[in-house]
């Protein structure tokens, strides 16, 4: 996979303010505010910044946390995991492997078959429904 390397100014020009704040500045959207939190359509969720396929809707589940949750990415190679010690916590941040967009965090409290919960900001995603 070819890395996408843009300046913050280039990202700011192509993203809306909320997308820029979360994807490029590692912000977080308010819980239960994202458009995909309750989404049930069948399809594939892509990175809003670079269009890399990230999650299949078949791996989406309702975790009750307020953000779209998935138990696995389409490919492990699509994600980079980074130790995050911000806000006095120890968590695992997940970023897009192609463009380094901040997506959210992964936690070890998800359902089978993986036991993982990828807690992802809606604003980082673009759902492409299956026909």
Curated annotation (Swiss-Prot):
Catalytic reaction equation(s): L-methionyl-[protein] + [thioredoxin]-disulfide + H2O = L-methionyl-(R)-S-oxide-[protein] + [thioredoxin]-dithiol
GO cellular component term of the entry, any: cytoplasm
Q: Which InterPro entries match?
A: Met_Sox_Rdtase_MsrB (IPR028427), Met_Sox_Rdtase_MsrB_dom (IPR002579), Mss4-like_sf (IPR011057)
Q: Name one Pfam family in it.
A: SelR
Q: Which SUPFAM superfamilies match?
A: Mss4-like
Entry keyword set:
Metal-binding, Oxidoreductase, Zinc
The main enzyme category here is oxidoreductase
Tell me the GO molecular function terms: peptide-methionine (R)-S-oxide reductase activity; zinc ion binding
Q: Does the keyword Zinc apply?
A: yes
> One of this protein's GO BP terms?
protein repair
Top-rank lineage group of the source organism = Bacteria
Required co-factors: Zn(2+)
Q: Does the keyword Metal-binding apply?
A: yes
Q: Summarize where Zn(2+) binds, as residue positions.
A: 47, 50, 96, 99
Q: Which family does it belong to?
A: Belongs to the MsrB Met sulfoxide reductase family.
The protein's name = Peptide methionine sulfoxide reductase MsrB
